[in-house]
Amino acid sequence: MIFMKELFLFLHVVLATFWVGGMLFLSLVVAPYLKDKPQIRNEAFQEVGKRFSLYGTFLSLFLLFVTGLVNTYLIQGGFRPSIHTKLGVFFVVVFISLLHDLWAGKKALYSEKHRVWAKWLGILNLILSLLLVYLGVRIRLGY
């Protein structure tokens, strides 16, 4: 059982690293690079966004949910209060991710309004995802 705990916690951390790290990379590296390149900015964001959406939003978030449930089951002592908060925030992140990827992000190429929406949904998603990392730390510390 110890091996299972380690395996699922490892997978959960790797997936969270991919998800949050990807958003940090997009906002701190890709976006500033493309800011001064208006001729390719929109198309580049569309292409990068599609790829990250597939692996980040759909695959990572689904697997984070599964590994999170398994990790919750494997924690001895039952549910911690932080788990309930983390689940609530997680579902908000999923909703915002879908709104960003399937609505605002897709229309951002053709509409300034949607580009602004996509930007702010992405920022909100990053902040909430960092909150999820913090809550994960609290859970591992027994809170």
From Swiss-Prot:
Keyword field: Cell membrane, Membrane, Transmembrane, Transmembrane helix
Protein name, UniProt field: Uncharacterized protein aq_363
Superkingdom of the source species: Bacteria
Transmembrane parts of this sequence: 7-29, 52-74, 87-105, 120-142
Transmembrane found in the keyword field: yes
Chief location of this protein within or outside the cell: membrane
Protein location: Cell membrane
Membrane topology: Multi-pass membrane protein
GO cellular component, one term: plasma membrane
Biological source species: Aquifex aeolicus (strain VF5)
InterPro entries found in the cross-reference section: TMEM205-like
Pfam families: DUF4149 (PF13664)
